[in-house]
Amino acid sequence: MSEETATSDNDNSYARVRAVVMTRDDSSGGWLPLGGSGLSSVTVFRVPHQEENGCADFFIRGERLRDKMVVLECMLKKDLIYNKVTPTFHHWKIDDKKFGLTFQSPADARAFDRGIRRAIEDISLGCPASKTEAEGGDDDLQTTEEDTSRSLVKDHFFQQETVVTSEPYRSSDIRPLPFEDLNARRVYLQSQVSQIPFSQQGLDIQSRSMEYVQRQISKECGSLKSQTRVPLKSIRHVSFQDEDEIVRINPRDILIRRYADYRHPDMWKNDLERDDTDSSVPFSKQDSKKSDYLYHCGDETKLSSLKDSVVFKTQPPSLKFKSKRRKEDGERSRCVYCQERFNHEENARGKCQDAPDPVKRCIYQVSCMLCAESMLYHCMSDSEGDFSDPCSCDTSDDKFCLRWLALVALSFIVPCMCCYVPLRMCHRCGEACGCCGGKHKAAG
């Protein structure tokens, strides 16, 4: 595999983090840096095949930052065994090879874990991305034809003049046509649409449909010359609802949220509601000081009489409304520790579990919990060097009783270990009150 293939487009990347690449040393029973120490850029990515229906290959590639040397390059398989030992150290096994990563923060570890899971799901499904692209190409022509037919039907049904207003919807403003006229128009439109020649290219379809619509408009405008002046009472009124809004999607925000925590979907909902409110486009009433937009139809006398009533206008949203809404929501930023969005006004202590907590670290050192972890590592760890949390209450662990008996025996030698549980309970009460715990920190 060449370097150009490995460093392909970001669209094929599932995760990109910075970590120290580790390997298992069976002789010493520990983990050592692979290819020497140093921080590396580790990427989980997909390499598509050249064939149309060929499935892609998935790789994990690690490149050391200081000298651009590739220290890790392995292919993902379905039988991958992935273990999350600590919040900042994960390791996996493929065939007989064992690799591990020491991350800079728990947020990077979670992002890498999600990327691995997504890649394994795509391997199990059998390359769904390529199937989607193949199906999308076959439906392009059918979608273009449906859009063209829909535009022709819409043009014939709204042959009367249209006035756009901002008044609330009233059922008396719209006068539906009789049932017989609707059936007659439907038969006429079906016969007209069936006569339109559709080519294979989308541009030819669009140009021919526009020519057809222009011919129909010129015929209708020519027939209006022989008729008398149409009164304003026959004008059809169309009202736009105030609730209709346009949703704007920020691609930069989507890329950032790619590694966001999936456990908090409410943040997406709040952001979309705020964007929808700010992007609404109201329609104003007629104003003689602003320009009017009309279509030339050939009948100058009729257009001059309807010029003051047929007006299309748009105005930008009110800045006062936007500033008021943002003030109510508060300023929001993204945390550098957990990569989640937070409100500065509600950023109290204990809100971020990944932020450094000096009080918790002090409790850990004062109660000598390092002695308990050392005992568990040397006496109760598995072949990979993993062991349970010293104070874990998970009864499913096969060494649950043995672990607690060992901790009780160790507490007679190191009495300060007995202070860990009451100090930890006080710390949790302080987190609930907002006195202890880590705080979010805005990026940048």
From Swiss-Prot:
SUPFAM superfamilies: PH domain-like. CDD domains: EVH1_SPRED-like. Residues 268-287 are annotated as: Disordered. Residues 6-123 form the WH1 domain. SMART domains: WH1. InterPro entries: KBD (IPR023337), PH-like_dom_sf (IPR011993), SPRE_EVH1 (IPR041937), Sprouty (IPR007875), WH1/EVH1_dom (IPR000697). Residues 333-444 are annotated as: Required for interaction with TESK1. GO terms for cellular component: caveola; cytoplasm; cytoplasmic vesicle; cytosol; nucleoplasm; plasma membrane. Residues 234-286 form the KBD domain. It holds the Pfam family WH1. It is a peripheral membrane protein. GO terms for biological process: negative regulation of angiogenesis; negative regulation of cell migration involved in sprouting angiogenesis; negative regulation of epithelial to mesenchymal transition; negative regulation of ERK1 and ERK2 cascade; negative regulation of intracellular signal transduction; negative regulation of lens fiber cell differentiation; negative regulation of MAPK cascade; negative regulation of transforming growth factor beta receptor signaling pathway. Residues 334-442 form the SPR domain. The modification Phosphoserine is found at S239, S309. Expressed in brain. Weakly expressed in lung, heart, liver, kidney, intestine, spleen, testis, thymus, colon and ovary. Also expressed in embryonic tissues such as heart, lung, liver and brain. Highly expressed in IL3-dependent hematopoietic cell lines (Ba/F3 and MC/9) and bone marrow-derived mast cells (BMMC). This is Sprouty-related, EVH1 domain-containing protein 1. The gene is Spred1.
